[in-house]
């Protein structure tokens, strides 16, 4: 592990029904770096992301964030560890506002979203929109945005968690 590595994946293994899909994966990412995973169908890209996101348990190996080993057992544990990712297929709501799409995952339980003041939702969402460089009003209905803009909303949502 290098001194400036923020995310370190060491010797990760994952099998399904006796078939080893991840075979000793190693990766280091410094703070502020952006990486992509490239590979053909069945190469293990999605499996690795699902292990990092807490959707699959790893069979062995270590995940370190900022020098601390983390145990990612579910998606909430991944969020607590500071890991988030966006899917190729957007997980957004066309009929809701941009602010609602960004902030909906930040609430502790379902069914309380309508209790949060719109002004507070918009103020909070505006910070994340600025971070991703999207110049739209938080109250804009998501369905009015282009697909590229919706992807930026998805990134803002992931960052907000």
Describe the residue ranges of each PLM region:
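Glycine-rich phosphate-binding loops of nucleotide-dependent enzymes
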Residues: 1-161
């Amino acid at each position: 592990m290098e001194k400036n590595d923020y995310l370190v994946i060491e010797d990760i293994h994952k099998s399904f029904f006796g078939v080893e899909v991840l075979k000793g994966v190693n990766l280091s990412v410094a703070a502020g770096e952006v990486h992509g995973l490239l590979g053909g169908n069945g190469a293990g890209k999605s499996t690795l992301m699902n292990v990092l996101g807490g959707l699959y348990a790893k069979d062995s190996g270590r995940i370190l964030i900022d020098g601390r080993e983390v145990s990612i057992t579910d998606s909430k544990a991944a969020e607590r560890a500071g890991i988030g990712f966006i899917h190729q297929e957007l997980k957004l709501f066309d009929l809701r506002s941009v602010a609602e799409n960004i902030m909906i995952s930040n609430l502790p339980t379902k069914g309380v979203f309508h209790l949060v003041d719109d002004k507070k939702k918009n103020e909070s969402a505006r910070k994340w929109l600025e971070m991703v460089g999207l110049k739209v009003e938080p109250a804009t209905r998501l369905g009015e945005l282009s697909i590229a803009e919706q992807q930026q909303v998805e990134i803002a949502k992931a960052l907000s968690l």
